[in-house]
Amino acid sequence: KIYNLIIRLNFYKNIKLRQKNILMAFRSIPLLIVTTIFILLNSPIRAQNFFKYDSLFIDQKPLKIRLNYSNNNLNKNTNDSTLMKTKLFFIQENKNKEIDVSLRARGNFRRKHCYFTPVKIKIKKRDASNTIFSDNRTLKLVLPCKNDRDKNDNILKEFIAYKIYEIISPFYFKTRRLEINYTDQKRKNQKNFNLIGFFIEDDDKVAKRFDSKIIKRKISPLAMDDFNSVNLSFFNFLIGNTDFSSAHQHNGKLLFYEKKIIPIPYDFDLTGWVKPKYGLGITNRLGYSFEERNYIGFKREKSIYSKVRNHYLTLKEKILKTVKLYEPEFEYKKSYNLMMNYLGEFYEILENDKLYNSLIVSKAK
């Protein structure tokens, strides 16, 4: 229904509608869906590609799910030949559903340092049929790391980082927030947890959305599209992310689209934006602390840097409004305030020529 409405409203270029008229049309639609729609309306690429493979991701309300498995046994399963079978319980159209799924652990760092293991989920076609998973049968499930006080706020901050990137670039991984009832099945007893998490779509689905392909080999960052590479470097600077490498595809994928190589990031937990306690004192491969905000990128034409800088300045209000939508979702006000201060510091740098040149432009390799 929403899809057809957007088709009528936006895809004919000769039709111009004022914002208030669109809002009247959408006033019965939940706020987060309206926000998603307006993001799509601002980009032809977003509008054309968001609705491919979207039965799970078009609805941005948190999806309630239930999982039961042994976290300890899952940690032993690290490849597709040793999948753990269980059931996924969820609610679809106000009805309780369950499907068979296969799980394996993912993420080297988190498997070593976290209580909750990140999960890759695979669903057989026959099991996913007639469910919201029919178009997305391979997914990443992101869970909190530790069972500590900040676990849900940390995962929410990481989720928000994905939503910021949706504003910044049309090339992104779709996400869906989750409310998870998880039972850790141990030998002697069972332990139950109520967690916040989210699904990330599979990279093959991203490629299909753009009628493109994922590049798996190592490629020099200088061979990648100038604007999209610098755009990603600015985003990583915004969230304080130094735990990535486009060349080695560490916490990122490369999309070959219209003869351009475009980097797409994921995994934003070890960042200054989230600042999890389990990251304190740990350094990355470059020797940077995960608490530091450092610009990592290669030198490009000054015009590219100026274009990206203006891009972020233009989007400032939209980013701020999007982030503020999630304020009521935080369990602790301090977590939200620290995140907003971190975002504010980024724009203080971007809006100050001296700071911008010394902390961004001069740091390019």
Regions found by a protein language model. Give the residues of each.
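Bacterial Sec-dependent N-terminal signal peptides
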Residues: 3-48
